[in-house]
């Protein structure tokens, strides 16, 4: 599966969940993924969802606690700073290589803009540095 991506890493950050539809099976699936990652490193950080999703968030917190892992709550970013962190049609965002992309459709506007992504990264980085 993702073993090639995990092998030799000293840190794995699990940042998933926003697009998962099966909330009832989320705990089991997330637990399985976490246990798989723990086979490669003990240093796994669980990052919560960007959009409030109580059932998924509860599952991630539970798995983090069961495995004595650090957990980063993130939903508050969108809740408190929605207008500053959500993308708008016409905004320019940048991919990981710095290439600009102008948002042309409504699909992407619910996602974090560059400011939102920076806030997410900053919160995760704070936990890494603990």
Regions found by a protein language model. Give the residues of each.
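Alpha-helical cap/lid subdomain in secreted, periplasmic
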Residues: 1-130
């Amino acid at each position: 599966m993702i073993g090639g991506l995990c092998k030799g890493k000293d840190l794995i950050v699990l940042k998933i969940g926003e697009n998962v539809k099966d909330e009832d099976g989320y705990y089991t699936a997330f637990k399985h993924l976490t246990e798989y990652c723990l086979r490669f490193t003990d240093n796994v950080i669980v990052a919560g969802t960007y959009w409030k999703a109580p059932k998924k968030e509860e599952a991630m917190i539970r798995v983090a606690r069961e495995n004595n892992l650090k957990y980063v709550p993130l939903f508050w970013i969108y809740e408190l700073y929605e207008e500053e962190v959500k993308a708008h049609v016409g905004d320019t965002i940048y991919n990981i290589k710095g290439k600009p992309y102008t948002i042309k459709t409504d699909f992407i506007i619910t996602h974090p803009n560059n400011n939102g992504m920076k806030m997410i990264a900053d919160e995760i980085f704070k936990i890494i540095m603990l």
